[in-house]
A protein has these predicted regions:
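Extracytosolic ligand-binding ectodomains
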Residues: 1-219
Length: 219
């Protein structure tokens, strides 16, 4: 939310910004955090709307965006709905910039949007698949027919972390492993991980990705 809010302010301050969400804890939380950060910097949200996930036709919302001359649309939600929205915006001749979060870091997004997804921006943590140290592991995944995109290697890191914590604890007992997790540092495909006093994992900061020609990469 903070990173996206800053980007909106830096690039769209004084322009028409819309923020929409799918009413889920994830989507609304992301949208609200982005709007709070944007407006705290002095930005003005021209339109704030909720939509229903699972629908196929977002033409009413898109028409509203068009009527309000929206320059940038932030979507707090998942790739399916965001993909339909950007496709329907392009069908209505709109060049509005679509921005979202980590849920759009999946090849399924482009399968929905086609060329309409060109230039879509999203925030996500640095891609561990691009780390040369993980080249061997990435090859194992691809050889098995699995593209290590999105959260695949993050899930792998979670398993690595648990296994190391259990090993350090000398037990699979949940309380023992939890104590080990809270006090240790763990070597993973993401780098060295530990947990803070709140129990949150210390991960690298968010970076920007852009969709171009059927794939996504760092902006």
């Amino acid at each position: 939310g903070q990173v996206a809010g800053q980007y909106l302010f830096d690039n769209y301050s004084g322009k028409n910004v819309a923020i929409v969400h799918d009413k889920t804890a994830y989507g609304k939380g992301l949208a609200d955090a982005t709007m709070a950060a944007f407006e705290a910097l002095g930005g003005n949200t021209a339109l704030y709307e909720a939509y229903t996930a699972g629908e196929k036709d977002y033409s009413a919302l898109v028409s509203k965006l068009k009527q309000n001359n929206i320059d940038a649309l932030y979507v707090g939600g998942y790739h399916t709905e965001a993909g339909l929205m950007v496709r329907q915006m392009r069908d209505q001749g709109m060049n509005t910039q679509l921005i979202s979060g980590d849920a759009l870091v999946t090849l399924e997004y482009w399968a929905i949007t086609g060329d309409a997804g060109q230039g879509t921006l999203m925030t996500f943590s640095p891609d561990p698949a691009k780390d040369p140290a993980n080249a061997g592991l990435v090859k194992k995944f691809t050889d098995a027919g699995i593209t290590p995109e999105g959260y695949v290697l993050y899930t792998y890191a979670a398993i690595q972390t648990w296994a190391q914590a259990a090993g350090a604890a000398g037990s699979n007992d949940s309380d023992s492993v939890l104590d080990s997790l809270n006090s240790g540092s763990f070597d993973t495909v993401l780098g060295s991980l530990s947990f803070d006093d709140k129990g949150d994992v210390t991960l690298p900061g968010y970076v920007w990705y852009v969709w171009e020609n059927g794939g996504y990469d760092y902006l």
